């Protein structure tokens, strides 16, 4: 019988073993995935393990599409594993895997990564994420999570204390390093959600473009003092100016006019309670208050 002694032997070692011409010892060639751009879009592309199976990202999502089928050579050997001469061998030809073309744009991805790296350094942040999408068709042109990792060395941690870690600690750090924060983590939308509030209120007719509001820099809602980002307030302004100023009191006022029921209806109609079904593993779901739990303060914030 045949026994595999060691997988993933480097080429130099394999060539030396061949030179010894040892009876019954055979070096089989294998293939390893190589990533020419090292860190580019590392968490999106993903990487393969020692058995060439996808581990994260597109590599694992499209494993069955990319992997193909191995070929085989069936021979007859003696008890020592040496092939018998004059005996016909059967060959099963390999079937190549398919090619996957992504919507990522190399230039846009590279530029976004450079910009994110600059912010990471300037702000001394733990991480910076950028997602650039074509809103007309949903194509992703760039998905950045810096610091990225080297796809050709995916098990190498950029941590000086790596040698002091337990196996469990090291695996946890690797899992965090491989995590695609753009889709695996949830985060508060902040003022970007004012777009949803504006659309819902305009559609329902609870506000018009020339409605006027007064912003003293805060609103008292029940027992909460909710501030605007401009401490002294924006004063008197129209709804359009309120949008331009991203004025919190304006949106608190129109949100209360809309009410929680209609607000939740539009939340669902915009698809915010559903997954996007992006073809990457581990998309996080929306975290939202239950309808019955949305009171004046929740609606205002």
PLM region descriptions:
Residues 1-6, 129-130, 251-257:
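Conserved short loop/turn motifs at secondary-structure junctions
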Residues 23-27, 121-135:
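Short N-terminal helix-loop-first-beta-strand/juxtamembrane motif that initiates sensory/input modules
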Residues 1-97:
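Small/polar-residue-rich segments within soluble enzyme cores
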Residues 112, 130-141:
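Short, glycine-anchored, charge-dense loop/turn motifs used at functional sites
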Residues 2-5, 85-128:
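Conserved, well-ordered alpha-helix/loop/beta-strand core segments that scaffold catalytic motifs
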Residues 14, 18, 41-45, 59-63, ...:
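Extracytoplasmic/secreted envelope proteins and their assembly/folding machinery
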Residues 34-38, 93-94, 123-124, 134-135, ...:
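Extracellular/periplasmic catalytic domains that process cell-envelope and extracellular macromolecules
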Residues 78-88, 136-191, 196-301:
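Beta-lactam-recognizing serine transpeptidase/beta-lactamase-like catalytic domain environment
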């Amino acid at each position: 019988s045949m026994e595999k002694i060691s997988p993933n032997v480097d080429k130099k070692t394999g060539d030396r073993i061949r030179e010894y011409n040892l009876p019954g010892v055979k070096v089989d060639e294998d293939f390893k995935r190589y990533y020419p751009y090292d860190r580019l879009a590392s968490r999106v592309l993903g990487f393969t393990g020692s058995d060439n199976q996808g581990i994260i990202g597109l590599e694992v999502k499209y494993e069955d599409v990319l992997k193909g089928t191995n070929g085989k050579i069936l021979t007859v050997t003696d008890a020592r594993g040496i092939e018998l001469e004059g005996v016909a061998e059967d060959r099963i030809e390999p079937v190549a895997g398919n090619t996957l073309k992504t919507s990522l744009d190399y230039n846009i991805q590279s530029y976004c990564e450079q910009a994110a790296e600059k912010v990471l350094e300037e702000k001394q942040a733990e991480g910076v994420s950028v997602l650039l999408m074509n809103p007309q068709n949903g194509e992703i042109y760039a998905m950045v999570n810096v610091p990225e990792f080297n796809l050709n060395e995916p098990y190498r941690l950029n941590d000086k204390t790596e040698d002091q870690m337990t196996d469990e600690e090291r695996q946890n750090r690797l899992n965090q390093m491989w995590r695609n924060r753009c889709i695996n983590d949830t985060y508060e939308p902040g003022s970007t959600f004012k777009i949803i509030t504006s659309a819902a209120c305009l559609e329902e007719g609870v506000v018009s473009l020339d409605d006027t509001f007064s912003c003293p820099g805060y609103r008292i809602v029940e027992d909460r003092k909710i501030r605007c980002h401009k401490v002294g307030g924006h004063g008197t302004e129209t709804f359009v100016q309120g949008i331009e100023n991203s004025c919190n009191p304006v949106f608190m006022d129109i949100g209360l006019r809309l009410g929680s029921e209609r607000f939740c209806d539009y939340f669902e109609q915009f698809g915010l309670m559903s997954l996007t079904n992006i073809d990457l593993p581990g998309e996080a779901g929306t975290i939202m208050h239950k309808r019955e739990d949305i009171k004046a303060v929740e609606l205002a914030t």
